Amino acid sequence: HYIEFIRELSVSCRKKGLVLSVDNYVPAVYNRFYNQKEQGNVADYVIIMGYDEHYAGGEAGSVSSIGYVENSIKDMLFLVPKEKVINAVPFYTRLWTGSGDNASSRAMGISEATKWVSESGMDLTWDDSVGQYYGRLDSQNGEQQLWMEETRSLGLKMDLIKKYALAGVAGWRLGLETSDVWDVIGWE
């Protein structure tokens, strides 16, 4: 039913000269019923939401590690031509408090997270395995962890978009980024 809706919507959009893009979680077994391959046949663009690798209620980790993003792009390219694929990057991160099953998190925009790191005194160290800065801090609230999204990590994601010659980049969500992010995202 979903794909039939997208088919019908695409016809109406074309008649009105509108561009139709469809956002998707990264390709996975649990979301195959969205039929990204058929979306690629009927929509102008298929967007990969290249984030929420680790999410509220799940285990602590990066919102968008570089390996996760690259694997997501490769998986989508098996289904949809590169000229129609857009990768969305996060303008946010998660501050994780606690550990194991007791971990909780809150989403923070890049600008808010940058300020929080400065005020908390958390030391960040570059982690090549995730392509992000990582920090850990013991506080009165317990262990706090952060995988920081910022210009260097977003630059690596932009490199993947160029490497695979995708149609473009999208972001979640305007207003959460710092102004220097636009220097990295600038499309050539």
Regions found by a protein language model. Give the residues of each.
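Compositionally biased, intrinsically disordered low-complexity regions enriched in proline and serine
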Residues: N35, D52, Y134-G135, M148, ...
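Generic alpha-helix detector with strongest preference for long hydrophobic helices that associate
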Residues: P27, G50-G57, D138, G142, ...
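Conserved, well-ordered alpha-helix/loop/beta-strand core segments that scaffold catalytic motifs
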Residues: L156-G171, L176-E177
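Substrate-binding surface in catalytic domains of secreted glycosidases
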Residues: Y2-V117
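Short, acidic/polar
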Residues: A28-Q39, E149-K162
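Glycine-rich, proline-tolerant flexible connector loops at the mouths of alpha/beta enzymes
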Residues: H1-E4, L176, D180-I185
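Glycan-binding loop/region signatures in secreted carbohydrate-active enzymes
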Residues: V89-L160, V181, W187
